[in-house]
A protein has these predicted regions:
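Structured functional modules or segments
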Residues: 218, 226-241
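Short, well-ordered amphipathic alpha-helical segments that serve as non-catalytic structural scaffolds
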Residues: 205-212
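Catalytic-core "active-site belt" of small-molecule-metabolizing enzymes
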Residues: 2-201, 215, 238, 242, ...
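DNA replication sliding-clamp ring fold and its partner-interaction surfaces
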Residues: 212, 216-219
Length: 259
C-alpha cells in the first residue's frame, strides 16, 4: 500500500472503531486527518472494507437545512451499509445515537447502470422505482458541524440507519418538487417540507449524485438505492418515539425507537 492508502486505512479504522465502540471522535489526529475531498473519499472506500457490503448511497446536505445541520456548503455522497438497513415498522436502537434526528426522504432504486458522463435525463431514465424513505443519520464526530467536508466524507457523509418504504406508482408524471412531506412523532406533527427542498426536485438530486460520484471515478449501478436527502428540517427524536413520515397522497413510512 502507498502512503495515501495507508493513511486512508488508518482514518477508516479510527472512524469504524468509534462507530462500533459507541464513542465519538473529538477530532482525527493530524497525521491521518483528510485535508481534501479526495482524501475523504479514499477513507470512505477504506471504511467500506470494514463496514461490509453497501447497497447504494445517501446524499447528505441537499437542502439548506441539511447543510446548516452538518456545517457544509454542498451535498456529500455517502455509502449505505447493509448492516444498517431496516424494514418499515422496525424498532431501531436508541442507544449510541449521537445526532438523534430523523429525516423524510425520496429514494430511487436504479434499474440499470449509469455510464460516466450521462445527462440528467439519462440518469433519471435509468431508475427502476421511486420509494418513500426514512433516514436516521449519525456521525462518529462529537462536533460533526465543525468536522468539515473531508472528514464527513470519510464518515460516509453521516450515514446511519435507513428504512426503504413503499414504492410510489406512476411517479414519472408527478411534480416531486411540489410533493409535501411531514414528520409526525408520537402522533404530533414535528416537521413539514417538500420535495423542492432537495436541490429543487429529488430527480435533480439524483442527477447531482451521479455528478458527485463522477468526481471520484464512480458511477451509479443497477440495484443501488439512492436516497436524496432530507425534505424537512430534521426534528429530534428520543427513546421510545414512534415516527411516521407522511408524503401526502403518495403514502407513508414509519419506524420506532427502542426505549
Amino acid at each position: 500500500m502507498g502512503q495515501i492508502d495507508s493513511r486512508a486505512q488508518q482514518t477508516a479504522h479510527a472512524i469504524w472503531s468509534a462507530w462500533t465502540g459507541g464513542y465519538r471522535l473529538t477530532r482525527l489526529p493530524k497525521e491521518i486527518r483528510p485535508t481534501n475531498a479526495a482524501d475523504g473519499w479514499a477513507a470512505q472506500l477504506a471504511l467500506a472494507e470494514l463496514a461490509g457490503p453497501s447497497y447504494g448511497y445517501k446524499f447528505a446536505a441537499t437542502s439548506k437545512a441539511g447543510q446548516a445541520h452538518i456545517g457544509v456548503t454542498r451535498p456529500l455522497p455517502g455509502m449505505l451499509f447493509a448492516d444498517f438497513r431496516r424494514d418499515p415498522g422496525a424498532v431501531l436502537p436508541s442507544a449510541g445515537l449521537h445526532m438523534r434526528v430523523v429525516e423524510a426522504e425520496f429514494a430511487f432504486l436504479m434499474g440499470r447502470d449509469v455510464p460516466s458522463g450521462a445527462t440528467a435525463a439519462e440518469v433519471v431514465d435509468a431508475v427502476d422505482t421511486l420509494h418513500l424513505a426514512i433516514e436516521v443519520p449519525d456521525s462518529r464526530f462529537e462536533h460533526f458541524e465543525r468536522a468539515g467536508e473531508p472528514a464527513l466524507l470519510a464518515d460516509a457523509a453521516c450515514a446511519g440507519w435507513f428504512v426503504l418504504g413503499p414504492e410510489v406508482s406512476d411517479w414519472r408524471g408527478l411534480d416531486l418538487g411540489a410533493a409535501e412531506t411531514e414528520l409526525w412523532i408520537n402522533g404530533a406533527r414535528a416537521a413539514t417540507g417538500r420535495g423542492a427542498n432537495v436541490l429543487g426536485d429529488p430527480r435533480a438530486a439524483l442527477a447531482s449524485m451521479a455528478d458527485q460520484l463522477a468526481r471520484f471515478g464512480t458511477t451509479l449501478r443497477a440495484d443501488q438505492v439512492i436516497t436524496t436527502g432530507t425534505t424537512t428540517v430534521p426534528p429530534p427524536i428520543a427513546p421510545s418515539d414512534h415516527v411516521q413520515a407522511k408524503f401526502g397522497p403518495l403514502g407513508s413510512v414509519s419506524v420506532s425507537f427502542a426505549s
